[in-house]
Design a protein with these regions (language model features):
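P-loop NTPase Walker
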Residues: 1-77
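Conserved RecA-like helicase ATPase core segment
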Residues: 121-222
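Inter-lobe coupling/hinge region of RecA-like P-loop helicase motors
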Residues: 1-5, 165-172, 193-260
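Charge-dense polyanion-binding interfaces
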Residues: 86-92, 281-312, 519-557
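Conserved helicase NTPase motor core
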Residues: 1-5, 32, 60, 64-154, ...
Length: 557
């Protein structure tokens, strides 16, 4: 099934799962659904519970990796996920897996365009082991934006070429107004390799608005930055929404606004600009190298669970131990700005697991990402990279596109994903020519020389800090909390109270800071974003982990 954006893919899939179980006499143990993220697996489980109640608990909805770790008989995490899918496929093909563990009559694959060579090998092995098995693969080749990690929509195409296969296109868009859909169709024609051939059709009678605002790349050899005009757009939208709310007759539910960028750095700079104008905004970004289960708050909670169940032989975590672990963790980390991520994760785990199996908790924690638990519901604005906006929708979308001269299909698909997130209005601020030919859009030219914001924020990731520097300071670091201020000096971060250095930036980050300093910026503040567990991959197995600080550096002109 080639499901276009806004076609109700998730709803259709959930209803199909319910139909298989209730109307088509498929037993729950014969049904397997595979997804590419823990967040997707959780969403399907939640929606299925709303539809069929407790019966949803018995349906196997797994990520490719967790299913394969199950077959290999071990719990894994994202760091160890490397060859696990490939190994599982080989074991199935070699007859090394008990037939009853892989005996399925229906296999459902979500986001099938994201399959890699190993994922497709697993699907092929399951098909070979279950000759009568039905496979329902749903995806959109135009939304394959993970080529960098090996995914390729050609594997979805190969499924369409298998014997007795049927190819269905879901082309009705229930999300976006007409001009937005027409513009997205126009743009998609630039993508060279496509499976879908039928244009998407908007189910709305309203036109909507698409604006392409073109900016010069530079004026008098000085680069033009597009943050300020996006801020001005946001201010206008917020003013417009406020006046609508004041008029009770035309009042709508809170309308959502999102700013989509290509890079994390752009997203963080945009966020800082919004905050400097007292606009509430939340950031959803890719957090390279940061694993949810390595957060200090998560590790402490797991430690309390481990201590509590040591005496019990039950695979299920008793409610009193669960509640005690929560209370102790919430109390210890009450001032931590990272605590909401843990709170939200536990809330979701409680909703989707009737019995709290210890193995399920570990799998849930190991497979989750920090950004899975970012609550964007109470923000005026969501600032996000395009990658992290996939699967979401907003009333208004503003895109910041500094595009390359020769965009690849991968880049074009990324822009297509961003464009199709919006329901009502799309505004693209760009300094290139890629969007010039879009007929359904209003084209504007803004010749103003916008400068960089006076304040920027740099978020340090693992590669931006000297990881070994923090080893001797583990105890001191574990006493700190996310959100606490630090003092920056000579490429080091220290505790304001004692002056003790606890972190140092990497050589690469020193060079980056040097470039900002040459533009007139200097670090004026620093604060802890996350405290995380870390150990070198080359370290001996018995070596203890270090605690490292990932901080935000505020720079001003």
């Amino acid at each position: 099934v080639a499901a276009g954006p806004g076609s109700g893919k998730t709803r259709v899939l959930v209803h199909k799962l319910a139909s298989l179980l209730l109307l088509e006499d498929v037993k729950h143990e014969q049904l397997l659904m595979l997804t590419f993220s823990r967040a997707a697996a959780t969403e399907f489980k939640q929606r299925l519970m709303q539809l069929i109640g407790n019966a949803a608990h018995f349906v196997e909805i797994k990520t490719f990796h967790s299913y394969c770790f199950d077959l290999l008989g071990r719990v894994g995490n994202l760091d160890e996920a490397g060859d696990v899918v490939k190994q599982a496929a080989e074991m199935i093909n070699n007859g090394e897996v008990e037939p009853n563990r892989i005996s399925k009559t229906v296999l459902v694959i979500d986001e099938a365009q994201d399959m890699s060579k190993d994922d497709y090998a697993l699907v092929s092995a399951l098909m070979k082991a279950n000759e009568e098995m039905r496979v329902i693969a749903v995806g959109d080749d135009d939304q394959n934006i993970y080529e960098f990690r090996g995914s390729n929509s050609r594997y979805l195409y190969e499924l369409t070429q298998t014997e007795h296969s049927r190819f269905i296109e879901m082309t009705e868009n229930y999300r976006s107004l007409r001009h937005i859909v027409d513009t997205a169709n126009d743009f998609a024609r630039n993508i060279r390799q496509r499976i879908k051939s039928t244009p998407i059709i908007s189910m709305s009678q309203e036109d909507g608005e698409v604006r392409i605002v073109k900016h010069p790349y530079e004026i008098q050899e000085k680069k033009v930055y597009m943050y300020q005009p996006i801020l001005e757009d946001v201010t206008r939208l917020l003013g417009s929404n406020a006046s609508k709310e004041a008029d009770a007759s035309s009042r709508k539910k809170n309308e959502t606004i999102s700013i989509l960028t290509q890079t994390n750095e752009e997203a963080v700079i945009m966020l800082a600009l919004l905050h400097s104008h007292n606009i509430k905004a939340k950031l959803v970004q890719s957090m390279d190298g940061l694993r949810f289960w390595n957060l200090a708050e998560v590790r402490y909670f797991l430690k309390k669970i481990d201590q509590g169940i040591k005496e019990t032989k039950s695979p299920i975590i008793p409610d009193d131990i669960w509640e005690a672990a929560k209370q102790q963790t919430f109390q210890k980390y009450a001032t931590s700005q990272a605590l909401p991520y843990l709170r939200r994760s536990l809330q979701i785990f409680e909703q989707t697991n009737r019995a709290k199996y210890y193995s399920d908790l570990r799998e849930f924690v190991f497979e989750s990402s920090v950004e899975d638990f970012c609550d964007i519901s109470k923000s005026d604005i969501v600032v996000s990279t395009i990658h992290k906006a996939k699967g979401h929708e907003f009333d208004y979308v503003l895109m910041l596109i500094t595009h390359p001269e020769h965009p690849t299909d991968d880049i074009l698909r990324r822009y297509y994903v961003g464009m199709t997130r919006t329901k009502r209005t799309l505004a693209i601020h760009t300094n290139g020519n890629l969007f010039d030919s879009l007929k359904s859009a209003q084209h504007l030219y803004d010749a103003q020389a916008y400068d960089e914001p006076k304040e920027i924020v740099l978020q340090l990731s693992h590669k931006d800090v000297n990881l070994g520097f923090s080893k001797p300071h583990k105890d001191a670091i574990l006493c700190l909390r996310s959100g606490m201020p630090l003092t920056y000096h000579d490429h080091c971060l220290c505790l304001p109270s004692t002056g003790r250095d606890i972190a140092q930036v990497s050589i690469k980050m020193k060079e980056k800071l040097g470039k900002w300093e040459m533009k007139g910026y200097k670090v004026t503040a620093a604060r802890i974003r996350f405290i995380v567990a870390w150990k070198s991959k080359d370290a001996p197995r018995d070596e203890k982990e270090s605690a490292i600080v990932l901080a935000d550096l505020v720079m001003k002109k």
